[in-house]
UniProtKB/Swiss-Prot annotation:
Full protein name: UPF0301 protein TC_0483
Record's GO cellular component terms: cytosol
Species: Chlamydia muridarum (strain MoPn / Nigg)
Entry similarity comment: Belongs to the UPF0301 (AlgH) family.
Superkingdom of the source species: Bacteria
PANTHER family recorded: UNCHARACTERIZED PROTEIN YQGE, UPF0301 PROTEIN YQGE
Pfam families, sorted: DUF179
InterPro entries: AlgH-like (IPR003774)
Length: 190
């Protein structure tokens, strides 16, 4: 995996929080950029898993294998809004937007509720809330060294272990980033 320069920040990139981002929701976050333009940016945190006692309260998912469905905190903004990342290219999901190869955002939730996902390989990530930046804000944070950039993939979004995602992505970038992947969360423990 190669670290991307800031000029390549676009939909489908990953933002990886620097170890300097300590405390708060963005500490050790890996964010999938879903939109980036001169007007601002938004993305979804991939590695802040939410444990839910009764996910059926959100959607009737009794026809899905639990290993294919995950819930996470997408970010601090509008936490009551649910955004769906999925791997279904089904015609029933045609109102979805492809973020990176085989990773789609949104769509009509009815294709899920009606069990229209046809492949056993298709996965879903329900994100509560999102992360957003006003025009110029993300650029400023990037120049301050608060974020690193890497390419996203379906494997990273749906298959990687959320609790190891931050360190794994940094490790895969190599060099000084691999060294950063071993920095303890609490520097007093170092």
């Amino acid at each position: 995996m190669t670290k991307l320069p800031y000029a390549l920040l676009e939909k489908g990139s990953l933002l990886i929080a620097s170890p300097d981002v300590n405390g708060g929701v963005f500490s050790r976050s890996v964010i999938l950029v879903c939109e980036h333009s001169p007007n601002g940016s938004f993305g979804l945190i991939l590695n802040k898993t939410l444990e839910m006692d009764s996910p059926e309260e959100v959607f009737p998912l009794d026809h899905f294998d639990e290993s294919r469905v995950r819930f996470c905190m997408g970010g601090p903004l509008q936490a009551n809004q649910i955004m769906l990342l999925h791997s279904s290219s089904s015609e029933d999901a045609n109102s979805s937007i492809e973020i990176c190869p085989s990773v789609f955002l949104g769509g009509d939730f009815s294709f899920i509720q009606e069990g229209e996902i046809k492949s056993n390989d298709e996965k879903m990530l329900f994100c509560f809330g999102y992360s957003g930046w006003q025009a110029g804000q993300l650029e400023k944070e990037f120049l301050e060294g608060l974020w690193f950039l890497a390419p996203a993939s379906q494997e990273i979004v749906f298959t990687a272990r959320p609790d190891k995602l931050w360190s794994d992505v940094l490790q895969n970038l190599g060099g000084r980033f691999a060294s950063m992947s071993t920095v303890p969360e609490n520097l007093l423990l170092n």
